Amino acid sequence: GRPERAGELRDALHLSRPGDLPGPAGESYLAWQRAAERSVSVGSLHRALPRLAPERIAEWLDAGSAGQGGPVARAAMVVEGVLRDAPRAEASALILADAALAQSLGWDHLVPLLAAGLKRADLRKRGEELYLACHRALVVGAAEALRLADELARRAAQLRAVTPKLRAKGAGDAVEMFLTRDAVAPRALPLPDRAARRLCDRLVDLGAVRE
C-alpha cells in the first residue's frame, strides 16, 4: 500500500528522533510490526490498525471465510471487501488479507506474503482477476520469505558467534535486541550512549551487523 520498499519504511521510523511523528511511511511500518508480533486475532489487528473498528475487522474476515475456495480465495475476498468499503485503505487491506491467509492455513502469526507480491495495479482488480493476482503474489512472496529467512538465519548465527568477543557490560542484552528486531538505533540499547556507539561500531567491524 506504500510506494516505499520495506527498508525505506523501516528507516522512516528508526531514523526519526525521539518525539518525532513517524509520518505515513513510519505508521505503515508500525502497523505491520504490530500486526505480526502477536497471534492473529481481531484484537491484535485492531491494535495494529486502530482507525478500524474491531467490528469492521471481524466483518471483513468473516466475509472472507464465508466464501467458497481455499486460503488464497479468502484472502482475495478480504482485499476486495476492504477496498470496496474503504478505497484508500490499501495498507489495511493487505494486512487483513495476510491475516486471513494465516488463519486459513492455521498459522498463529501472519507473514506478509501477499503484501510482498501484490502490485498497486493488482489492488484495483476485482473478482477472478484479483484472485489470480493473489495466487501469483503468493508465489513471489513465499520465495522472498524463504530467501529472507535463510539470510536472517545466517546473520543471526554470525552475530551469536562474535558475541563472546564483546567485552562491554550489557553486551549480551544488546545482542539479544539485535536478534529480535529488524533495526536497532544505538540510543535504544541498554548501555550508556558512548558505550552503545562503540558496541555498534565493533559489531560493524566484525561483520555481524550492517550500518
Regions found by a protein language model. Give the residues of each.
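FIC/Doc superfamily catalytic core
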Residues: G1-E211
